[in-house]
A protein has these predicted regions:
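A domain-start/cap signature at the N-terminus of enzymes
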Residues: 2-40, 111-126, 130, 134, ...
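Loop/turn elements at helix/coil->beta-strand transitions in domains of secreted/extracellular proteins
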Residues: 35-40, 65-70, 107-110, 131-137, ...
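Active-site machinery of serine-nucleophile hydrolases
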Residues: 40-41, 46-95
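Solvent-exposed loop/turn segments at secondary-structure junctions
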Residues: 46-50, 69, 74-80, 117-121, ...
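Alpha/beta-hydrolase active-site loop
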Residues: 80-106, 111-113, 125
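The feature captures the conserved acid-bearing segment of alpha/beta-hydrolase catalytic domains
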Residues: 135-220
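Alpha/beta-hydrolase-fold serine-hydrolase catalytic core, especially in secreted/extracellular enzymes
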Residues: 196, 204-338
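Solvent-exposed beta-strand/loop surfaces, strongest in extracytoplasmic domains of secreted
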Residues: 304-473
Length: 473
């Protein structure tokens, strides 16, 4: 949702992004009825951080527990290398947000580092360097703590004697991106650090680039549990919060996920678990373990189905060795903005359209990039708060075809990406005249924007920051 509200923003001091040659910008959302911020979840700009943080259902759940969200674009420091200034920049960012928002507790609020894919390694390292302040850790479609397979593909940070004992951490891996070598380091970490609290979810029926509503609900429950189990009943908001350290033996164990598994050990309290504890993960309690098992049950023993995209009446090619498996061309209508794509079911090779699938239609949704959905097959280019000056990302669009499955067929997904020609360097140059807005009196709910193009083209707007929404002009 590119129109989602972010009330405040600050620049990240001391850091220059190679994507913009400028300071990254951090955006803060706090629930509108929040009297006290009890935690802040921080994610930087890779892909699905933005998708999750602007998910309406997820925001509703965060409002219930008083969790704020910070999204930083461009992302920086995939390692959390304190020698490169990340720690100082992080602390200054929260000081600045406390000053401009009026929520002074942001200076000391517990943090949940969150990252996807190439940014999914830093959350563990953040926790190792900030154990007293880390409420929980989430590595989404990512990797294990201290892994040798980092999301960014290079060496990991060396922890020395640091640990994340007593801090709940969650690793999530999609079923359709499954790789045993990513899971094994998480199991090994539990053996190496028996006081650690490492949870795991196989995001069944999902891939690497997407985040379903049901997964957002799972994350929300994990965060709610972290607050329930770790925050003291009362504390001084103007001082660091003394978080409770968890004892893993007070939690539950559940067997790790296996592809095509027919029998599973029953989830149970830590000391009563009858399966192999070396092949199991930790969970807060019965509710969290049961939700994990239910996710696995929902997709078990169902028939697979496959998705593709049609553009100009042709099924787009599927490239199994590519990171994003389907690529489109930007083929806009005469306005230069509107384009069309259709999601279809295909055979297992993604070469022909198939009739073997669920009875309902798949849908296309935005993952990231300057795009807005008009209807099931129509989309339009719309720039947003990421800005116009990111040479890597401003022109990148990534979309998702998905279907949640039914009693017979599994949930399935397929991603697609392409670039738009940005910036345009051909044709007549245009100028936009955007008259300033005068003082607005209290009680006024809407203001008309009167920008015009000297070429007579329509002008579009987006909210960079602040509690406002755009409705045409």
């Amino acid at each position: 949702c590119i129109a989602a509200e972010w009330q405040w923003s600050v620049q990240i001091p001391g850091i220059i992004s190679n994507e913009t040659d400028d300071h990254p910008q951090a955006f803060l959302w706090i629930p509108s009825d929040c009297a006290q911020v009890r935690g802040v979840m921080i994610g930087t700009h890779n892909m699905t951080e933005e998708t999750l943080f602007e998910n309406l259902l997820f925001r509703e759940k965060m409002s219930e527990i008083g969790m704020g969200l910070i999204w930083i674009t461009p992302g920086w420091d995939q390692k959390w290398d304190v020698s490169a200034g990340s720690q100082r920049a992080f602390e200054q960012m929260l000081e600045d947000f406390a000053a401009i928002s009026g929520y002074n507790e942001l200076k000391y609020v517990p943090i949940v580092p969150f990252g996807h894919s190439a940014m999914a390694t830093y959350p563990w390292n953040f926790a190792a360097w900030n154990p007293e302040r880390t409420l929980a850790v989430i590595s989404f479609h990512g990797d294990a703590p201290r892994t040798n397979l980092t999301g960014y593909g290079r060496d990991n940070m060396e922890w020395g004697k640091r640990t994340i004992d007593g801090i709940p951490g969650l690793m999530i891996e999609g079923e359709y991106e499954w790789w045993e070598d990513r899971v094994n380091p998480a199991l090994a970490f539990r053996l190496m650090y028996p006081r650690s609290c490492i949870s795991f979810l196989c995001d069944t029926g999902r891939g690497h680039f997407d985040i379903a509503d049901r997964t957002a609900v799972y994350l929300a429950l994990f965060l709610k549990k972290a607050m329930e189990y770790r925050l003291p009943e009362t504390y001084d908001v103007d001082k660091p919060v003394m978080l409770k350290k968890l004892n893993p033996e007070n939690g539950w164990l559940a067997e790790r996920w296996h592809p095509d598994q027919k029998r599973r050990a029953k989830a149970a309290p830590f000391k009563q678990y009858k399966g192999d504890p070396h092949d199991a993960f930790w969970y807060f309690d019965k509710e969290m373990a049961d939700m994990t098992e239910e996710r696995y049950r929902q997709e078990r023993r169902k028939k697979p189905q496959y998705l593709g995209f049609v553009q100009e009446n042709s099924l787009l090619a599927y490239h199994p060795k590519s990171h994003v498996k389907v690529a489109a061309r930007f083929l806009p209508e005469e306005d230069g903005l509107t384009f069309h794509l259709k999601a279809v079911f295909t055979d297992s090779l993604h070469t022909t359209i198939s009739d073997e699938h669920s009875s309902t239609f798949p849908e296309i949704t935005r993952i990231c990039g300057p795009v807005q959905k008009v209807n099931d097959t129509t989309f339009t280019v719309r720039f947003y708060r990421m800005g116009m000056y990111n040479k890597r990302r401003t022109g990148d669009i990534c979309l998702l075809a998905s279907h949640d499955g039914d009693n017979q067929y599994k949930s399935t997904v397929q991603e697609l990406s392409f670039r738009i020609p940005y910036r345009n360097t051909e044709g007549k140059r245009q100028y936009i005249l955007f008259p300033g807005i005068g003082d607005v009196k209290a009680g006024v709910e809407s203001v008309t924007l009167r920008a015009t193009s000297d070429c007579g083209l329509p002008v579009y707007y987006y909210v960079k920051e602040g509690p406002a929404e755009i409705d045409k002009n």
